[in-house]
Amino acid sequence: MNYGKLGELGSVSRLTLGGGGIGQVWGPTSHEEAAATLRAAVEGGIDLIDTAPMYLNCEAIFGETFEGALPAHVRVTSKCDLGTPPVGQAASLLEASVLRSLATMRLERFDLLFLHSSIAPEGYAYAHGDSRRDKFSTRWDLYVDEVVPALEGLKSKGLIRAWGITGIGVPQTVLQALDHATRPQAVQVIANLMDSAGGIRRFAEPAAPRTILAKAKENGVPVLGIRAVQAGALTAELDRDLSPNHPDRKDFERAQGYRDLCRTWGEDPADIAHRYALSMDGVDTLILGVKNRDELARTLKAEAAGRLDPAQIAAIDQLGLRT
C-alpha cells in the first residue's frame, strides 16, 4: 500500500474503504462478509474508512466489527445529508447526526465529517428532482451563514477533527465553496475516466470534476476521489438490476469500447479504472465501493500495480467517453 497526505489527517493510505459497499448500496453481501471485508481492509494497509448513516447498515456493522476498539492508526469519516432545513436548525441537526453515528459506531470522534448534501446557488432549480431539492441540496446562504460555523463548532467540541464537503453539487457552487474564506478541509470529487457522476447528478450543467480537482489542488484542499468505476459502469458487468434508462446503465453501455480496450490489454476493466483514478492529478486517496473480500483483494492488487502509463491513459481518453 502506498500512502499520501490528507491535510490535517496527515499520512493516509491511497485507498479508502467506502461504507457504501459494506452497507450493500453496491449490491448484496452478507453481514459476515461485510465485517470480514472491514477487517481485511485494515490488514491490507487501508487506514481510512468512509462511512455514512445513509449507507444502510454500514454503521452498525462497523460498530459490531471493531466493538469500540478501533486500531489506533485507523481514521474514520462520516457524512450528514443535511439538505436545507429551516433557518436556525442546521447546527442542532448536524450535531444530532454526528452523535447518533458515533454511538452506533462506538466511537468518540470522527476524523472527518462531510456535508453530503449538494451545495447550490440561491433560487437554483435542478433538472431532476427539483420538487425535493430541500431534501438533498443545501443553499449557499445557509451553507455560509449556518453550516460552516456549525461544522467549526463541532471541531471546537471535539466531536470531529476536520470537516469537508461532497463535491457533487452544482459545479459553480462547489468551486465557490473551495474559494470561500473558511474552506473545507477536504472535498470528495468524482474521479473516473468518464468524468461521470451517473445517477447522482441532478443538474443540467457539465459535472466538471477535473475543474473542481484543479481548484482544490490550487487552494490546498485535500481530495478523496469517488466513483472510480462509476457505480459499476466501468466494470465487466453490472452487479445489480438497473432500468434501461438509468444513467449508470447508460454509462455501462456507452463504455463497451473501454471494456474492449481492456480486453486487448488482458486486463480487468475495474482494475484499470481504479488505476486511472489513482493516476489523476490531485487525487490524494480513492474511496472504494467494494462489498466483499474478493473485490477488495483485486483493488489492493490494482493499487500495488501503480499508476497507468501515459500511453494507456491516452488510449482511454481517445475513446471519447468523458461527459
Predicted segments with their positions:
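N-terminal small/glycine-rich loop or linker at the start of catalytic domains
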Residues: G7-V25, T77-T84, F114-S117, P121-A127
